[in-house]
């Protein structure tokens, strides 16, 4: 199989001037001056030059505007300031399967040349090349001017896209305070290791890459992670086995999503997502690390430490509930059978055994939230509790519940009103555009950890489970800088993909059409002043139509 034009990554800390492999994408996995590229200016310029009435051959203008914009960024990276970040000609090879293209393609030109299969091939290559996410400078560049799954706002009437979304650099998430976000960023590798060791079904992993009779290489994508993994084929050990890059909505080109953990086969040559014919579903996981439960196990005055000790000594559902309910605002919110859940927590329950004194219900549900509440109400979560680590062996194990099982089913499910659910719904929508025939299985992972004791500091902890043995030479490990795992909760989520698809597709297309008409009018009438919304801080000001907001 021929390799794509962008199938290699250089992880050298210094920008590479010499191209190691012909046809390969080269860029350092560090913050560099490529971030100074005026992404916003070019994107708005592309919008201004695009007719709202362009012929898209049954597709939408937004996707071709996005592709034209990405083409400009990638070709700019081929030679900025005499330093090569991507292979000269690789962008044309990716877009047009040729090394030459006379000039930057206009969206209408792309609409006349690219098929739906071409678009998916290009965007799947971009996803593969942007794994590493925040450590990947290209991920950061391409994510600008996108409405992302983690930043899209929702109102009672549905998703809300600001009128001037094209001015907004969507580079940071907006959920939670800075301390909570820092805790999540620090401990996400620990949660990822737990997902790999406990949550991923071995049946999802042991799937052959090559099913065709002419295939000569027979191995499994995830069997030999240090020798034949697609992660190494793209050149960086910092890319995890199930890591996902930037997925751009193939329907509108407006929305982007980067999944925390994606279990899907990849092409062994290019690293692009490539489910084999035997796959019927794709699992992905959104990780949330709960900073508000962080505690010192040796602090006798901390009630979390006391309830944690009780839970470890007597692992029952009642003691688990007591631990979770120890803090003022627990991660599980109770609502009565006749009440509605509030928006406070991502996990909810209406089970009488989980009733909490002083609970407050929420306002009336939107029709979509009520629908998703019905879909998820009968779903249960599974919980794993961890023993204290064995420092001599460098391992950590899960406790056995009274039933003898390592996981406990609890009557807790996802809250459709919470921002985490909305984020996962958007991720599901974006991923479904690439693989419409496959069942998508999203999960919310809740990680709770504790402070390390002095003798535990600096010790990596291998997650010692039977399932983890399939990883052989790359056993899932809690990095030494992470908290010691205490509890992990796995919550399946059911999303009505057709309904969410219609809502988000219509919203995205309307936002694109509105932007095209607005900017085209501004371009033709530069002296007109109008009220403009600064999406960065929500303020309103009068701006000349030819000026951009100061972000």
Curated annotation (Swiss-Prot):
Keywords: Endonuclease, Exonuclease, Host cytoplasm, Host nucleus, Host-virus interaction, Hydrolase, Nuclease. One of its GO terms (molecular function) is endonuclease activity. The record marks 188, 260, 286, 288 as: Required for function. Pfam families: Viral_alk_exo. Disulfide bonds: none annotated. SUPFAM superfamilies: Restriction endonuclease-like (SSF52980). It is found in: Host nucleus; Host cytoplasm. Its main location: host cell. Belongs to the herpesviridae alkaline nuclease family. Interacts with major DNA-binding protein; this interaction increases the nuclease processivity of the alkaline exonuclease. This is Alkaline nuclease.
């Amino acid at each position: 199989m021929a390799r794509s034009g962008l199938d290699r990554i250089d992880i050298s800390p210094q920008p590479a001037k010499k191209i190691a492999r012909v046809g390969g994408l080269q860029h350092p996995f560090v913050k560099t001056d490529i971030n100074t590229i005026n992404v916003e200016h070019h994107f708005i310029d592309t919008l201004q030059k695009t007719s709202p009435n362009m012929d898209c051959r049954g597709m939408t203008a937004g996707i071709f505007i996005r592709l034209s914009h990405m083409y400009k960024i990638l070709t700019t990276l081929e030679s900025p300031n005499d330093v090569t970040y991507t292979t000269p000609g690789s962008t044309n090879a990716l877009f047009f399967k040729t090394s030459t293209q006379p000039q930057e393609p206009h969206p209408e030109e792309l609409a006349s040349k690219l098929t739906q299969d071409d678009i998916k091939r290009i965007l799947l290559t971009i996803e593969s090349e942007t794994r590493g996410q925040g450590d990947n400078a290209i991920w950061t560049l391409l994510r600008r001017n996108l409405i992302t799954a983690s930043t899209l706002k929702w109102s009672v009437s549905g998703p809300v896209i600001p009128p001037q979304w094209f001015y907004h650099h969507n580079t940071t998430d907006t959920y939670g305070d800075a301390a909570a976000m820092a805790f999540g960023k620090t401990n996400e590798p620990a949660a990822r290791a737990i997902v790999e060791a406990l949550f991923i079904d071995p049946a999802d992993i042991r799937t052959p890459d090559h099913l065709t009779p002419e295939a000569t290489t027979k191995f499994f994508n995830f069997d030999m992670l240090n020798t034949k993994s697609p992660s190494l084929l793209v050149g960086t050990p910092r890319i995890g086995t199930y890591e996902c890059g930037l997925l751009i909505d193939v329907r509108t080109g407006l929305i982007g999503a980067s999944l925390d953990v994606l279990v899907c086969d990849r092409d062994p040559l290019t690293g692009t997502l490539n489910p084999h014919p035997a796959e019927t579903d794709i699992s992905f996981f959104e990780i949330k690390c709960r900073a508000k439960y962080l505690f010192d196990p040796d602090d006798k005055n901390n009630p979390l430490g006391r309830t944690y000790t009780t839970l470890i000594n007597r692992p029952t559902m009642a003691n688990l509930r007591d631990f979770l309910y120890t803090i003022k605002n627990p991660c599980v919110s109770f609502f009565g059978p006749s009440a509605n859940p509030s928006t406070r927590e991502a996990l909810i329950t209406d089970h009488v055994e989980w009733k909490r004194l002083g609970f407050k219900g929420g306002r009336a549900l939107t029709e979509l939230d009520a629908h998703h509440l019905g879909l998820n109400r009968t779903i249960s979560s599974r919980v794993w509790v961890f023993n204290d680590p064995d420092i001599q062996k460098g391992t950590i194990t899960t406790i056995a519940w009274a039933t003898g099982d390592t996981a406990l089913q609890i009557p807790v499910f996802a809250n459709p009103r919470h921002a985490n659910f909305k984020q996962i719904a958007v991720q599901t929508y974006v991923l479904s555009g690439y693989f419409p025939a496959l069942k998508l299985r999203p999960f919310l992972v809740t990680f709770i950890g504790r402070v390390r004791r002095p003798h535990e500091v600096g010790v990596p902890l291998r997650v010692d489970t039977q399932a983890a043995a399939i990883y052989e030479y790359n056993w899932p490990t809690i990095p030494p800088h992470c908290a010691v795992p205490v509890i992990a909760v796995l919550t399946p989520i059911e999303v009505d993909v057709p309904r969410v698809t219609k809502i988000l597709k219509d919203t995205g297309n309307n936002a694109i059409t509105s932007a095209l008409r607005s900017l085209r009018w501004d371009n033709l009438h530069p002296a007109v002043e109008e009220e403009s919304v600064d999406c960065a801080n929500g303020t309103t000001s009068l701006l000349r139509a030819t000026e951009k907001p100061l972000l």
